[in-house]
């Protein structure tokens, strides 16, 4: 009489382990890129928050306002998030009037200088994303950006 086989053979288990290894070889780098892209998006959110400050400063004809002074209620030119630090830079150019032209104001985002410095992806740590503000108030990625193109959020990528 023939006995029934119960369980898995060693070969079957080794094949399953090999398949899981192959899947992990593709999934882990893709997951790391996903994490870096999501952390890079925080910088653009910080820049959006600085739009109001830039608009207020433009009433005085400049991009940067006075430095932060909590005693007088001045909020300053920086905003710090979990993964990035965003800072207003640049010089206002009043001669630009077309909605798609840069107005001279920039927001420089430095990754790895946020409140969770040790928890940021190594793929974007120390990288900068420089956003040029257009006359219409929107941002595009500008010169001085050393963040890899695949991590720059689509909302600020220059359309090619």
Swiss-Prot record:
Pfam families: N_methyl, Pilin. The chain crosses the membrane at residues 8-28. The modification N-methylphenylalanine is found at residue 8. GO terms for cellular component: membrane; pilus. Residues 1-7 form a propeptide. InterPro entries: N_methyl_site (IPR012902), Pilin (IPR001082), Pilin-like (IPR045584). It is a single-pass membrane protein. Its main location: other. Keywords: Fimbrium, Membrane, Methylation, Transmembrane, Transmembrane helix. PROSITE patterns: PROKAR_NTER_METHYL (PS00409). Coiled coil: none annotated. One of its GO terms (biological process) is cell adhesion. SUPFAM superfamilies: Pili subunits. It is found in: Fimbrium; Membrane. Belongs to the N-Me-Phe pilin family. The pili are polar flexible filaments of about 5.4 nanometers diameter and 2.5 micrometers average length; they consist of only a single polypeptide chain arranged in a helical configuration of five subunits per turn in the assembled pilus. NCBIfam families: IV_pilin_GFxxxE. This is Fimbrial protein. It comes from Dichelobacter nodosus.
């Amino acid at each position: 009489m023939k006995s029934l086989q119960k369980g898995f053979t060693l070969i079957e288990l080794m094949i399953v382990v090999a398949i899981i290894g192959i899947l992990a070889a593709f999934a882990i780098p893709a997951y790391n890129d996903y994490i870096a892209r999501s952390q890079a998006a925080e910088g653009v959110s910080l820049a959006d928050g600085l739009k109001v400050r830039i608009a207020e400063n433009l009433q005085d004809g400049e991009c940067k306002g006075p430095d932060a002074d909590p005693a007088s209620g001045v909020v300053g030119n920086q905003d710090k998030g979990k993964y990035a630090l965003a800072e207003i830079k640049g010089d206002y150019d009043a001669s630009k009037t077309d909605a798609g032209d840069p107005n001279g104001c920039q927001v420089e985002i430095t990754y790895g200088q946020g409140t969770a410095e040790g928890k940021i992806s190594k793929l974007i740590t120390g990288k900068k994303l420089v956003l040029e503000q257009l006359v219409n108030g929107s941002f595009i990625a500008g010169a001085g950006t050393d963040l890899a193109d695949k991590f720059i959020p689509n909302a600020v990528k220059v359309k090619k």
